[in-house]
């Protein structure tokens, strides 16, 4: 009988411990996700080169969230949570320090350095350390962790940043249409370079489309579709190249202290050209599916 009572007491204690550890982990997870969510907003601003006045309020909000979370996590004073609380507290503190000092200073720079990518890498490492500790705690106490929408968003951000960084690392200057045009035309006037790029793409796309239409009228629909696909990829490539060049010239090159607003307007007009081309292509594809294309031109 005594052994049975001891067993029941042990089971009850284990159940209470499991409930307590699960509840505490959920609390820590909620507090971490609050900081992660606002940090994701900050990263969006950093990677799209938002102005300082738009990102600073987010930094201040992040600091306010952290102060409340710090007090909430500090209430967990059981021995089981000691390591979890220490790791989470230390890493959240570093996140706030890097954001409130280094990042805020960087936002005031003109032109800005490449610290934005460094900052994102630091955030990924610090949140990764927190996640590793939380997973270890969950494993130790047999708690099931579920990935929230906030965590999914943050992970997707990190994947996107890694992808773009890898893409830029593998790109040479000769791959840039603007860089090529600059060497051929011999001018550094960005308005002229963007205009030349637009005309080049426009001429090339017209050439490709005329070939594609000719194949369609001759009944070679497979080749027609292949040309249409190539045309879409051409527009996407040119659009991406233009955006990358604009961003690089505006923020990364030290010799450009400022970029005239006319340059930005020129780039926007060029991008709107690509948008219109895509809309026209969508209409043509709809007519192609419905077998309602215009008649072949008379020879």
Residue spans for each PLM region:
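Short, solvent-exposed, charged loop/turn and helix-capping segments
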Residues: 67-91, 101-114, 205-229, 243-247
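N-terminal, post-signal-peptide region of Sec/Tat-exported proteins
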Residues: 41-78, 190-204
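Residues marking helix boundaries in flexible regions
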Residues: 9-12, 202, 209
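Short amphipathic alpha-helical coiled-coil/interface segments
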Residues: 59-66, 88-92, 96, 123, ...
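Intrinsically disordered, low-complexity segments enriched in Ser/Pro/Gly/Ala and basic residues
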Residues: 11-13, 21, 28, 38-39, ...
């Amino acid at each position: 009988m005594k052994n049975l009572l001891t067993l029941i007491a042990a089971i009850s204690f284990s159940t209470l411990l499991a409930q307590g550890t699960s509840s505490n982990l959920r609390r820590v997870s909620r507090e971490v996700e609050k900081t992660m969510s606002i940090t994701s907003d900050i990263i969006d601003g950093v990677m799209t080169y938002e102005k300082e006045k738009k990102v600073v309020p987010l930094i201040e909000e992040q600091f306010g969230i952290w102060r409340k979370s710090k007090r909430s996590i500090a209430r967990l004073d059981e021995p089981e949570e000691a390591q979890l609380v220490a790791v989470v507290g230390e890493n959240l503190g570093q996140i706030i320090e890097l954001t409130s000092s280094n990042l805020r200073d960087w936002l005031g720079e003109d032109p800005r350095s490449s610290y934005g990518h460094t900052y994102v890498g630091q955030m990924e490492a610090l949140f990764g350390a927190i996640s590793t500790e939380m997973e270890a705690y969950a494993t130790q106490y047999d708690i099931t962790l579920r990935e929230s929408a906030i965590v999914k968003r943050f992970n997707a951000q990190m994947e996107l940043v890694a992808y773009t960084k890898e893409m830029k690392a593998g790109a040479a200057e000769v791959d840039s249409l603007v860089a090529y045009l600059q060497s051929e035309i011999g001018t550094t006037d960005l308005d002229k370079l963007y205009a030349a790029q637009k005309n080049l793409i426009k001429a090339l796309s017209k050439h490709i489309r005329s070939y594609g239409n000719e194949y369609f009228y001759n009944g070679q629909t497979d080749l027609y579709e292949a040309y249409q696909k190539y045309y879409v990829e051409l527009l996407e490539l040119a659009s991406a190249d233009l955006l990358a060049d604009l961003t690089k010239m505006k923020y990364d090159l030290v010799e450009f202290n400022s970029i005239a607003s006319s340059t930005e307007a020129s780039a926007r007009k060029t991008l709107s050209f690509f948008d219109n081309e895509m809309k026209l292509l969508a209409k043509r594809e709809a007519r192609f599916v419905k077998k309602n294309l215009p008649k072949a031109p008379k020879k």
